[in-house]
Amino acid sequence: GAHSVQATIAGKLWNNWVERFPVVYSDIFKDAMKNHDISLSYAMAISRQESALEANVQSPAGARGLMQLMPGTAKDTARKLTDINYQSAEQLFEPSVNIRLGTQFLEQVYQQFDKNRVLASAAYNAGPTRVKRWLDESQGKLDVAAFIESIPFTETRNYVKSVLVYDYIYKLIMNNKASGIQTESEFTRLY
């Protein structure tokens, strides 16, 4: 389960992929993502990076739960949904609520940035406004690797790299076709 991630880190079991990348809460993820374009592997990768798949974690900044949602983001996202009764930030520790709101927000930034996981992941971590600013600054002159390296926040830069690799690993674990770390459109786009 989710605690296995921490156990593999403590035990330095770096090659134990199934334990390091558990497929937990998959039914909740699948249910929450019924009308979304994001893949299960991508949503799991975000959750793995955000919380190591621990439901009851809170960041120093106040982000909560599996997908590490800020209460304000959760509230804004819940307003757009009719199938969730979001009343309190404490609900973000409930996997079903956190995953429903987290996958909705992830889908929102994924669509906003033309289904590009590099940009959507950066936006999920640092906010869409910052990503737009970084794109304005790069003026469409950078390939994907240069754009990722140009992200001014070390945390976000590393976050994007980790999420892309984790998505690839989850695709392999879940027996999906994994053709590469980046999609063709992510690789060929200028940023």
Where are these regions (language model features)?
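Catalytic glycan-binding domains that act on GlcNAc-containing polysaccharides
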Residues: G1-Y191
